[in-house]
A protein has these predicted regions:
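Transmembrane alpha-helix termini and helix-breaking/packing motifs in multi-pass membrane transporters
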Residues: 27-38, 154-178
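Central cavity-lining transmembrane alpha-helices of secondary-active solute carriers
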Residues: 25, 48-71, 92-93, 155-158
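Intracellular juxtamembrane helix-capping segments at the cytosolic ends
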Residues: 119-138
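Loop-to-transmembrane helix entry/capping segments in MFS-fold secondary transporters
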Residues: 45-49, 136-147, 180
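C-terminal ends and interior cores of transmembrane alpha-helices
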Residues: 63, 83-105
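Helix-loop boundary and gating motifs at the non-cytosolic
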Residues: 2-59, 105-109
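Glycine-rich segments within core transmembrane alpha-helices of 12-TM secondary carriers
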Residues: 116, 140-165
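Hydrophobic alpha-helical transmembrane and interfacial-helix anchor sites in secondary transporters
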Residues: 69-74, 164
Length: 184
């Protein structure tokens, strides 16, 4: 196999983009926004329960799907198409979070679970592509490049979102009530 630099960089830059979901949505702002905007802010135990259930349900769904998706990925002919499908599914549902009105926690949880299933499922196909773009000798260095770019991309977007959240007046196009919606 001859290594193609363009394929290596494309693979690594996907991690740059998809790690932003993990840092910004999953770890950073969805839990905050869920508790303060969609769920009842006066009942943190209830919102913690709903968010915990959402995380449990998506994890169970992904655990059930993973062996089947992994088998499909091992066959090799549909890796890229399925990566695109699941990434698109996750992107659409994440983008949809910005149109969900305050108090509609059920819809927010549904969109979040579908987005996270898309994110996790796309990673199955993303991970399987490394053997198609890197020689056995280079797998570690290519994987490290993707991992490093993922941390960089996720960290930079998280920093930008923290600034947007703490100092919304820096960004004129944000409206006070919906400032967090644009984080998604």
């Amino acid at each position: 196999m001859k290594e193609n630099r363009r394929s290596v960089w494309s693979w690594a830059l996907y991690d740059w983009a998809n790690s932003a979901y993990a840092t910004t949505v999953m770890a950073g702002f969805f839990p905050i926004f869920f508790k303060e905007y969609w769920a009842d802010p006066n009942n943190p135990n209830q919102s913690t329960f709903y968010l915990g259930m959402a995380n449990s349900i998506y994890a169970i769904v992904v655990a059930a799907l993973a062996p089947f998706l992994g088998a499909i990925a091992d066959q090799g002919s549909k890796k890229k198409k399925l990566l695109i499908f699941f990434a698109f599914m996750g992107s659409i549902m994440t983008g949809g979070l910005c149109i969900i009105n305050q108090g509609h926690w059920q819809l927010a949880v549904l969109f979040y679970m579908i987005a996270t299933i898309g994110y996790a499922s796309s990673n199955i196909f993303y991970d399987s592509l490394i053997t198609d773009i890197a020689t056995e000798k280079k797998v570690d260095s290519v994987s490290s490049l993707g991992y490093g770019l993922g941390y960089l991309g996720g960290g930079l977007l998280f920093l930008l979102n923290v600034i947007m959240y703490l100092k919304p007046h820096f960004l004129v196009f944000l409206m006070e009530q919906q400032q967090l919606n644009f984080l998604f």
